[in-house]
C-alpha cells in the first residue's frame, strides 16, 4: 500500500477535523468522491490524545462504510476501541483491525519502558497489518505499509529510558516495586543490570548500597558491576547506570581487602580499552572522572597514558563532555604524566582549533591556571618546578605568537584576558601588550571581543606601558583629513570603543581620588594621571550634548560629576564649569541626536593614520 494512502491523525489537535478532509496529519489526499472509484486507505488512531473525541464520528462512520478502508487501533484497548463496543460500531466488525503493542494506554504517562514503542514492535505491527490487509484485499498485495515513529509527548521521559524493565517478580499487583524488596534478592536473582538501568531500580540500588553490607554482598556487587567488561560499559553509558557505577567504584576503591589492587587493575583495563569512546560519552565521562579521582595514583597515571595523541585528542578537548576529563586530569594528576597534553595543545595548528572552541578554550585556560598555581606550591621538588616552568613557557610562547588572532575570537579572547589579568603572568602580559596591542589599540577597541582585552590591558598594565597606551590614544593617530576626528572621538561614540574610553576615565578618576596606586617603585605618577584626566574632561565637556543622548555618554558625564562632588581638589573645579552638572545635558537638541547617528555610521569604519612608524 502506498505511503500516500496512509492517514495519520494529528497529535495534540485542538480543533475537530473530519476524516474525509483533504488534510490528515502530514499527508494530503483528495476529498472522497462517491463517483470516483474508492481506493484502499488506512487510519491510524494509535496516537490520539483526549481531543480525539472532538472528531465528527458520524462522518467517520460514513467513511468507514467503504469496506476497503481500515481503521487501525491498539490492543490493549485505546479509547477508540472502547467506542467500538457502541451500537453504532457493531455494523463494521471487519473495518477495525486491532494492532497489538506493549502499551497499556495512549493517554496514561508511564515511568516504565512499556511506554515506548520500540522498533521491534513496529516490525511486528507492520507484518500483522500487512497480513490482515492482504486477507481482505487481494488487490493490495503489492502495496507496502510504512509506519513513522510517533512523536514523544511533552511529558514523556521514554527517551531517557533503557530498553530493559524491572523483572515481574520485583513488582506488586499494582505494577510498583515491592516495598519489602531487599538487595540480597536482587543480587541473587542476577537481575542487577535491569535494576541499574531503570530510574526507580537505580534509586533503590543507590540507597541500598549506602547501608550496611556484608562482605559477600560487596563481593557480589563488585563482580556484577565491574567484574565483566560488557556489563561495566553498558552501565557506564546509561543515564541511570553511570551513577550506580560511580557508587560501586568508590566503594570498591575504599574496600581495602586482598582484591583491591586487582579490582583497580581490571577497572583501569576496562576504561583504557575504550578510552576515547567513554570520554566522548555524556555519561561514561563521569565514570572516568570518578575513577581518576579515587583510583590509586599509579594506576590513574597509567589510565592517563591511554589518552590518544592524534586528532582524537582535539575531539576530546573540544567536546562538551570529554573536556571535563582533561580538566580532571590536569587537576589531580602530576604534570609529568600529562605533559604530552601541553605539548599537543601548544602545537600551532592544534592551538587554533582548541582555543577557538567554546569548550576547548576552557581546557587551555585550566592548564594555564594549574601551571601558574603550582609556582607557589612548596610541595613540588625543584625538578617538578623546572618541568612546570618549561611547560608554561612552551604554551605561553605559542599563545603570544597568535595573541592578536586569539584576542579577536569569540572564545579565545578569554584566554588572553586571563593572562593579562594575572599578576603571576606579568612577563607574558607585558609581551602581549607590546607585541599584540600597542600600535593597534584603535582598531582592536572597535572589535567586539578584542575591546575586552584592551580594557583588561589598561587596568593591569604597568605604569610604563600604561603611559604608552594613553599617549597612543590621545596623540598616536593623525586626525582624519576630511572630518577632523581623532582616535578619541571615534572611540567615544563607537559601540565597543566607548567601553575602553570609560575604562580610561575610571582609571584616571580612581588614581586622582586615591583609590588607585600611582607609585611604581620610587616614582609617583600622579601628575600623569591628572594630565590624562584633564584631556578626557575637556573632550567630554566639548561633546556633552552628543554624549547625553547615549547611556555610555551619560556614564562618562556622571563619572566626572561624581569626582567633582567628592574630590573637588583635583584641579578642574575652580572654573565652575557647568559640564559636571548632569541636569544641564537635558537641553540637547534633537538635531544633535540625529547628527550623532549619522556620524556614528561613518566613524565606525574609520582607521586613522598612525603618527609613528610601527
From Swiss-Prot:
Residues 1-24 have a biased composition (Polar residues). Residues 160-564 form the PUM-HD domain. Its main location: cytoplasm. Residues 283-614 are annotated as: Binding to gld-3 isoform A. Keywords: Cytoplasm, Developmental protein, Differentiation, Repeat, RNA-binding, Sexual differentiation. One of its GO terms (cellular component) is cytoplasm. One of its GO terms (biological process) is sex differentiation. Fbf-1 and fbf-2 are >90% identical on both nucleotide and protein sequence level. Experimental approaches often do not distinguish between the two genes, which are collectively referred to as fbf and are considered to be functionally redundant. Interacts (via C-terminus) with gld-3 isoform A in an RNA-independent manner. This is Fem-3 mRNA-binding factor 1. The gene is fbf-1.
